Amino acid sequence: LIRRQRQMSIRDSCLLADLTNYIMLELGQPMHAFDGNKIEKIVVDTPKESFQFKTLDDVEREITPDTLMIYDNETPVAVAGIMGGLDSEIVDGTTSVVLESANFDGVSVRKSASRLALRTDASARYEKTLDPEMTMLAVKRFIKLLKDVDPECECASKITDVYVKKYPELKVEFDKKFVDRYTGIDIPCERIKLTL
């Protein structure tokens, strides 16, 4: 995990943050881990007025009303899709985590990243528009990898999946005879379904 992050020029920090970075490299889905002991209730909103916010890179930034933010109730804890804040940072003593795996609007993230002069690996991915179905897959992957490292850890709450606009389910129809003719072999229907 650490070797792969270093090959991709992503610095290693602590296990929980490293797992989110690893999954971003593996699946393309950015995630953010908040110290669960510092978070009561996650709220996603834009601020009513401008304010100063210190991001994880220890830089004080001016947040304007058109910047999408993540709040703990009314306290800002992250710039949505770009970078978290210092106040909810994962540290070595973190024993509880609130995991964010989201799908933020690419245009909004790009404008905020540009205005803040803060382009990150996460913002670069959000700018390209992500598959909303990857968010749950990324959360499940995080849990699996964490349990591989620490089998005693447990998921303390239900996973919440909120869609602003649900994508319609797509059905793909194809002719099995065409698949057999194209591949030159007879592939069982069950294997085709499993592969798809």
Please tell me what each predicted stretch does.
Residues 4-7, 11-196:
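RNA/tRNA-interacting regions in translation and RNA-turnover enzymes
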